[in-house]
Amino acid sequence: MAASRSLVPDRLRLPLCFLGVFVCYFYYGILQEKITRGKYGEGPKQETFTFALTLVFIQCVINAMFAKILIQFFDTARVDRTRTWLYAACSVSYVGAMVSSNSALQFVNYPTQVLGKSCKPIPVMLLGVTLLKKKYPLAKYLCVLLIVAGVALFMYKPKKVVGIEEHTVGFGELLLLMSLTLDGLTGVSQDHMRAHYQTGSNHMMLNINLWSTFLLGAGILFTGELWEFLSFAERYPTIIYNILLFGLTSALGQSFIFMTVVYFGPLTCSIITTTRKFFTILASVILFANPISSMQWVGTVLVFLGLGLDAKFGKGTKKTSH
């Protein structure tokens, strides 16, 4: 994306980043729900999509190809000295987080998944304190407390609400918790790479997705999921089109996020992605008839308020002295 300085005027760069992130991940979210929660076929023989490993495999292949193109045209001067084993280790948590997140959609609705994934500051802070010995400002803890309160309100259902799936905290929520924890580990690994090897975003995107492709490729062959998916795709060929678009919007969205961080910093990027997630929940409610109670809306607002305040006031960290 280095070439974008000459290709895009300064005054248009922020609107381009905002629209790029918003449109790509907005459509990504719609496709994700359509693929994973849609019904295929007619009548009593309707089927659901259960091929989480294959979905993430295709996504990683497209991400790796896209990163390779970016390096080839815009990032040829950078020499990557990051240790190979670090990429391999990071890819394990990266794959686990994405597979868990997609698998969770078989058990929880999309607003719950988006809200759950929005709680990333919680494991990041916990892992930062325990593994990296970081100290955070009071504002950070208050923001995380606000997020926790919002999630608690969203998950609490005192009585049955018409049209809302009634369930206790179960396997879907555990998958989201696992995804969040693995996201935190991925973030710690990526911070280590940047701090010790000055790893570029495009090289990181390429190598982590390449290793993830190898892991997932072995997984879908070993479990036989690949052949089941191909049979499913033969019965419902439109799924291929949706999955390819899903992977493409993911890769484009990542590139716009990196561009936003480079030119405007993590604060602006955090505000844009937080806004996008809120409107993705709204779209899911409207387009896919995922009703949300008034208490859940209050919880949703609290979560995004906590995320917004965290982006503004909770970024200061310092390492403890040893």
Swiss-Prot record:
A motif (Di-lysine motif) lies at residues 318-322. It is a multi-pass membrane protein. Pfam families: UAA (PF08449). The keyword Nucleotidyltransferase does not apply. InterPro entries: SCL35B1-4/HUT1. One of its GO terms (cellular component) is nucleoplasm. The chain crosses the membrane at residues 12-32, 51-71, 85-105, 136-156, 168-188, 210-230, 243-263, 285-305. GO terms for molecular function: ATP:ADP antiporter activity. It catalyses: ADP(in) + ATP(out) = ADP(out) + ATP(in); UDP(out) + ATP(in) = UDP(in) + ATP(out); UTP(out) + ATP(in) = UTP(in) + ATP(out); dATP(out) + ATP(in) = dATP(in) + ATP(out). Its main location: endoplasmic reticulum. It is found in: Endoplasmic reticulum membrane. Keywords: Antiport, Endoplasmic reticulum, Membrane, Transmembrane, Transmembrane helix, Transport. The di-lysine motif confers endoplasmic reticulum localization for type I membrane proteins. Belongs to the nucleotide-sugar transporter family. SLC35B subfamily. ATP:ADP antiporter that catalyzes the exchange of ATP and ADP across the endoplasmic reticulum (ER) membrane. Imports ATP from the cytosol to the ER lumen and exports ADP in the opposite direction. Regulates ER energy metabolism and protein biogenesis. Appears to be part of a calcium-dependent ER to cytosol low energy response axis, where calcium efflux from ER to the cytosol triggers ATP import into the ER lumen to maintain sufficient ATP supply. Provides ATP to ER chaperone HSPA5 that drives protein folding and trafficking in the ER. This is Solute carrier family 35 member B1.
